[in-house]
């Protein structure tokens, strides 16, 4: 049961489940710290790579908590566990993946944006889906600088993720939506934040090489294999990701500085 009578420690936290994402974890955590995320509740789904070494600086300073999670498929269960065990520690929790980067294109404080929705138990944040940007193999740069071609605005109701008030949540319905104690809402979320103010850059494919590696793993939400082949996924994303977008690059200089600093403190 969520301990709703306890004071919160953070305004905004992130919950995510991952498997063998070591090459991307430091960038992802460091970026979200820059935009105001204070805590990370991360569920390790039987990784065999160097993820703990990559996360060591953030674990050491108390920013990241790693939970071993050998549950299959595990994503929805991890989200429910996070709400029950850590919901009292944060006013808002964003439930996103390691290939998703939350930020404000209008350069507003995310905490201030969310304060406008304090009367709601959750909000939906739209995706901007990025493709390979022509990369056949993993490029040497960071994720946010390597991929700059995205799709147009979200085309259907599943192109979003949720940021919730844990006290208003009953359970996760899947990777995108939750059921809420107050059921007086039509649709998957109580309200969507405008795309121009808050969004998630979703680097789903990355390079062709990385996409092929990704599709070899089972889905975190169902445990099933990914439906599209790599060729089919690349064909779809290449055709649909033609909008140049570098709004997130305003964070690049600060992100590089942060990564340089944490590299020296890695265990």
Predicted features and spans:
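Catalytic-site signature of metal-activated, phosphate-bearing donor transferases
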Residues: 1, 77-80, 104-267
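A short, glycine-/small-residue-rich helix N-cap motif at loop->alpha-helix starts
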Residues: 23, 71-77
